[in-house]
Swiss-Prot record:
Name of the molecule in the record: Protein WVD2-like 1
Assigned protein family: Belongs to the TPX2 family.
Keyword list, A-Z: Coiled coil, Cytoplasm, Cytoskeleton, Microtubule, Phosphoprotein
UniProt GO molecular function: microtubule binding
Ranges of compositional bias, category Polar residues: 234-247
Cellular-component GO terms for this entry: cytoplasm; microtubule
Pfam entry (one): TPX2
InterPro entries linked: TPX2_C (IPR027329), WVD2/WDL1-4 (IPR044806)
PANTHER family for this protein: PROTEIN WVD2-LIKE 1, PROTEIN WVD2-LIKE 3
Gene name of the record: WDL1
Subcellular location as annotated: Cytoplasm, Cytoskeleton
Length: 286
């Protein structure tokens, strides 16, 4: 559905240079074309009063299609009672009839010129912005690279600072844990000390009389000690007395031993161990 301009009202005062236009759009019910047209408010009066203006208007109307003419005629018939009603309500319209007619004609000419020029195309050189965009992109990436480099430098500086702090703390810790003594004592490098010579004890140790008295004597110890004493006595007697007296004592001692051996039960029964001889025989053989 197309739209048509039903009414154009322009109020122009003598003191004000700018004009105000009131446009009331109305949709035509019967037309199906998409063309837009302008209808003058007072077309009939302008034709009767201004002859040259009417001629120009006829020329403009000649350029229009027959469909648009029929549409204008229908619209003018429908708008006639509206204009008749508005005229007595607005008495100022009578004073500015000429100005309104001139404006309406100028507007119609402008619309026709626009419609005529709509099909024309003027050649113009294309404007390429790729170079400008490339420059902007280059600047953007350059700034981004500088920002990344600054961040990388700051990160490296922070890492170096942390490393220095750790090394300083480690040195201080080692200094606190340092021992005053040498790590290896001197005796590790010195020769071992000389071992003292062990004195060999004599084979027969002298016995003190106190130990002998305090120790309990067994039967064998008593016999051995008594025999030793007797031997020592006999040796001393031999040196003092003559040989005859010593032989007599020895004979007496031997006789006592033989008598004791004969009195034993084994000798009496005659059952002795093999290899043993009676005491008398041994004494006789000696």
């Amino acid at each position: 559905m197309g739209r048509e301009v039903v009414e154009v009202l322009m109020d122009r005062n003598a003191d004000v240079s700018s004009a105000r236009v009131h446009v009331a759009p109305k949709i035509a019910a019967e037309e199906t074309d998409e063309e837009f047209e302008v209808k003058e408010c007072t077309e009939e009066k302008s034709l009767s009063e201004n002859a040259p203006n009417v001629g120009s208007a006829e020329r403009v109307g000649a350029q229009k299609s027959p469909k648009t003419r029929n549409g204008n005629a229908k619209v003018s018939k429908q708008d006639a009672p509206l204009l008749a009603v508005r005229k007595p309500l607005q008495p100022e319209n009578k004073k500015h009839i000429d100005d309104e007619d001139n404006c309406s004609i100028a507007s119609s000419v402008a619309t026709s010129m626009r419609m005529g020029k709509s099909g024309l195309t003027y050649g113009s050189a294309p404007t390429f912005r790729s170079a400008q965009r490339a420059e902007k992109r280059k600047e953007y990436y350059q700034k981004l690279e500088e920002k990344n480099q600054a961040l990388e430098a700051e990160r490296n500086e922070l890492e170096q600072r942390q490393k220095d702090e750790q090394e300083a703390a480690l040195k201080q810790l080692r200094k606190n844990l340092k021992f005053k003594a040498k790590p290896v004592p001197n005796f590790y490098y010195e020769a071992p000390p000389a071992k003292p010579e062990l004195k060999k004890l004599p084979l027969t140790r002298p016995k003190s009389p106190k130990l002998i008295l305090s120790r309990r004597k067994s039967f064998s110890d008593a016999v051995s000690s008594s025999s030793r004493e007797e031997i020592l006595k006999t040796v001393s007697n031999r040196n003092r007395h003559s040989t005859g007296t010593v032989q007599n004592k020895d004979d007496d001692h031997r006789n006592k031993n033989t008598n004791a051996a004969h009195d034993s039960p084994r000798v009496r029964s005659g059952k002795g161990k093999s290899g043993l001889k009676p005491v008398n025989e041994s004494s006789e053989e000696a």
